[in-house]
Design a protein with these regions (language model features):
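Structured catalytic core of nucleotide-sugar glycosyltransferases
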Residues: 1-132
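Hydrophobic helical membrane-anchoring modules
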Residues: 2-7, 182-320
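Residues in soluble alpha-helical coiled-coils and helical-bundle/repeat scaffolds
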Residues: 15-19, 102, 106, 174, ...
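Membrane-embedded alpha-helices of multi-pass transport/permease systems
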Residues: 18, 25, 105-108, 159, ...
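Solvent-exposed polar/charged
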Residues: 62, 87, 113, 117, ...
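Acceptor/aglycone-binding surface of glycosyltransferases and processive sugar-polymer synthases
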Residues: 70-74, 78-88, 93, 105-183, ...
Length: 320
């Protein structure tokens, strides 16, 4: 990298993005070339793609020595792989983005302007999206709920991770040593001065989204269990409230039966309804407890973020 220039690191992960990678590189390079005062690098992590993405990444790396590639040995998912790319960026400011180009590179100029004003964290927040209406409503509800139940710094609504992060922030993130990191929440937790820049999230350029109901649920629950103990305390509170309610209902039924012994018929329906209700509540909170136990299990195993098969253009930074 050249002498006194600050280095911008563009980081992303990909899985079967062969149709998007070349356009991703060209659009980002075109944007970066507008800032000759900065040098740049790309750090792209591939999750064991099967559609020829790796061949394209190798070609781009051969054409541009600043294009660094991490080839994972397996698909390590949408949480760990992009975070590993961020952790391996060497730039003075690190940009986290998506390889499907839903985060338009042209927004970078607004992000950089805020960064140069002295902000350590500049988050791009969606003002508009082309997502399904119902999905967007669910997302807004989730962020609203997470904001209400989180005791500390709040996760920004509409923030997907796209933004600029100063090197001091990256070094702070490395101290977490979290094998399953919730990046958006960690950015809120480190506490550096943060500003937001609204942007319109574009449609995926080519191909289909790799997110499904499971991956969205995984991300949502990871955010909850990493940032609040309220669901566990709700389980205790519900247990107490429902226990008291059960005693009161039992007492009322007993009194009514004493008063109208021959005419008051208890019936089967209240028993069945009560059984299903209490069983549902129990299963719900057993599931909540299971999520927290799963998070603890992930932590205590202390496994690496990813297993890397190969690195390209990381001279002096690991195996090539």
């Amino acid at each position: 990298m050249s002498g006194e220039k600050k280095v911008i690191s563009i980081t992303a992960s990909c899985y079967n993005e062969a149709e998007n990678l070349s356009v991703f590189y060209e659009r980002w390079r075109k944007v970066l070339e507008q800032y000759p005062a900065y040098d740049y690098e790309f750090v792209i992590a591939d999750n064991c793609s099967t559609d020829g993405s790796r061949d394209i990444l190798r070609r781009l790396a051969a054409e541009d020595p600043k294009f660094k590639v991490i080839l994972n040995s397996a698909n390590f998912g949408h949480i760990r792989s992009p975070y590993n790319a961020i952790m391996n960026a060497s730039g003075d400011l690190v940009v986290s983005t998506c390889s499907d180009l839903q985060d338009p590179p042209e927004v970078f100029s607004e992000l950089l302007k805020k960064y140069e004003e002295g902000c350590k964290v500049v988050c791009a927040v969606r003002s508009e999206t082309n997502a399904n209406v119902m999905m967007e409503l669910f997302r807004r509800f989730y962020y609203w709920l997470l904001e209400k139940i989180s005791p500390g710094e709040k996760v920004l609504s509409g923030f997907t991770g796209f933004g600029i992060y100063d090197r001091v922030c990256i070094e702070a993130l490395k101290k977490f040593n979290d094998p399953y990191p919730y990046f958006r929440g960690m950015i809120a937790e480190i506490g550096f001065r943060t500003v937001t820049v609204p942007y319109v999230q574009e449609k995926r350029l080519h191909g289909k989204t790799k997110n499904n109901l499971f991956t969205l649920y995984d991300m949502a629950m990871t955010g909850v269990v990493h940032h609040t103990k309220l669901p566990l305390r709700l389980a205790v509170s519900f247990g107490v409230v429902l226990g008291v309610l059960s005693l009161l209902i039992s007492l009322i039924y007993f009194i009514l039966k004493i008063i109208w012994w021959d005419t008051f018929n208890l019936g089967v329906a209240p028993l069945v309804i009560g059984l299903f209700f209490f069983s549902s509540v129990q299963l719900l909170f057993i599931g909540v407890i299971g999520e927290y136990l799963g998070a603890v299990w992930t932590q205590v195993r202390n496994r690496p973020l990813v297993i890397e098969e190969e690195r390209i253009n990381f001279q002096g930074q690991g195996k090539e």
